[in-house]
Amino acid sequence: EKAIKQVKDMFQNNLSAQLALLRVTAPIAVMKDTGLNDDLNGVERAVTFPIKSLDNATAEVVHSLAKWKRLKLAQLRTPAGRGIYTDMNALRPEEEIDNIHSIYVDQWDWEQTILPEQRTVAFLKQTVRRIYESIKVTENKLYVEFPQIRPQLPEQIHFIHSEELLQM
């Protein structure tokens, strides 16, 4: 448990430094019919409840923050090259439960403002390299704290195209 907590803390600190991310608090619920609770797979059914002080208006427990993050970036007037990160606690009652899926989701997430001309494969790869560097730094710091957890990741990330995979 201690290692898990340290990995989470180290990684968010490393990534927020690499990608200029600001930590923001995510909502646990949003108002129904605002469009902020993404319908991830077309059949998501949100957990709903009335809010007494709002004339019993209906709120939904979040199951995705994709749209909310973009709205938050706009509200904060986040310039290109900067972004946000958050912890989302969600309920997904439609989830198929197995050894890696639960109806409860504790998900760390981030979003960054980019310019239209940055929507390129080159920029995506540059961002992936920065994320990978954050993972590598986290792995190395974890090794210092827990020497039994040896670093295993290669020095550099390798990109492969789906066509190359088909030819294998």
Name each region found by the language model:
Residues 1-101, 109-113:
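Class II aminoacyl-tRNA synthetase-like tRNA-binding/catalytic domains
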Residues 102, 124, 131-135:
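Non-heme Fe(II) oxygenase catalytic core, chiefly the N-lobe of the double-stranded beta-helix
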